[in-house]
C-alpha cells in the first residue's frame, strides 16, 4: 500500500466522476494502492482488494514515524477497545499509529507481540515495542522512547489515557517481550 486516505471519509466511485455510483468509502488513514491516475482521480485498490476511483486530493503519501503518529493521541482518555481521540487503549494506540502510516497490523497486544520480531534489550531503539502481561499472553503494550521512557495508553491510579512517562516500576516486572514491527 503506497498512499493513505487523508480525509475523514472519501467516496470510492465506480468511474472517475462525482456522479458515478458510490461503491464504498475510505476512512481517514486507510491504506490503498494507486493503480492509475486520470484527470485528478486515482484508480485505487484497498487493502481488502476492493477497486474504485477516488479524488487524488483525498489521498496522501505514506510517510512518517509511528511515535509521532501515536503522539497525536497524547491526552486522549483510556478506553478499552477504543481507537479514537475520544478514547483509546494500549493496543489500539499501536494499531492506529501504524495504520496512519499505511501498515495494517493486528489489533490486540498479544497478536501484535506475535507479529513482531524479538529484540534484545541491548538492541532496543526508539519505536520498538514492549509487551507486558502475566501467564501466557500479553495484556499491555507500549512504545519504547529511549532513556527509560515509554509512550502508551494506560488506566491506573492517578493516570488515565495516553502518556509519555518513565516506565512505571510496577510494569517493569511484567515485561514479556521486546519486539520490532
For each of these PLM feature ranges, what is it?
Residues 1-4, 68, 83, 145-181:
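Aromatic- and glycine-rich peptidoglycan recognition patches
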Residues 1-13, 96-111, 145:
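Short, basic/aromatic beta-hairpin or loop at an interaction surface
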Residues 5-34, 78:
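Beta-loop motif signature
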Residues 24, 50-52, 140:
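Short beta-strand segments
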Residues 77-84:
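Second-shell loop/turn segments in exported
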Amino acid at each position: 500500500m503506497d498512499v493513505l486516505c487523508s480525509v475523514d471519509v472519501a467516496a470510492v466511485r465506480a468511474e472517475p466522476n462525482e456522479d458515478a455510483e458510490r461503491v464504498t468509502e475510505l476512512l481517514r488513514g486507510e491504506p490503498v494502492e494507486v493503480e492509475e491516475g486520470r484527470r485528478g482521480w486515482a484508480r485505487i485498490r484497498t487493502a481488502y482488494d476492493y477497486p474504485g476511483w477516488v479524488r487524488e486530493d483525498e489521498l496522501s503519501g505514506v510517510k512518517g514515524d509511528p511515535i509521532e503518529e501515536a503522539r497525536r493521541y497524547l491526552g486522549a482518555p483510556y478506553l478499552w477497545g477504543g481507537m479514537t481521540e475520544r478514547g483509546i487503549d494500549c493496543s489500539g494506540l499501536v494499531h492506529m499509529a501504524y495504520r496512519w502510516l499505511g501498515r495494517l497490523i493486528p489489533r490486540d497486544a498479544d497478536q501484535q507481540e506475535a507479529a513482531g520480531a524479538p529484540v534484545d534489550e541491548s538492541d532496543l531503539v526508539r519505536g520498538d515495542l514492549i509487551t507486558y502481561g502475566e501467564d501466557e499472553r500479553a495484556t499491555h503494550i507500549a512504545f519504547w522512547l529511549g532513556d527509560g521512557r515509554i509512550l502508551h495508553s494506560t488506566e491506573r491510579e492517578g493516570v488515565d489515557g495516553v502518556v509519555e512517562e518513565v516506565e512505571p516500576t510496577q510494569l517493569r516486572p511484567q515485561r514479556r517481550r521486546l519486539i520490532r514491527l
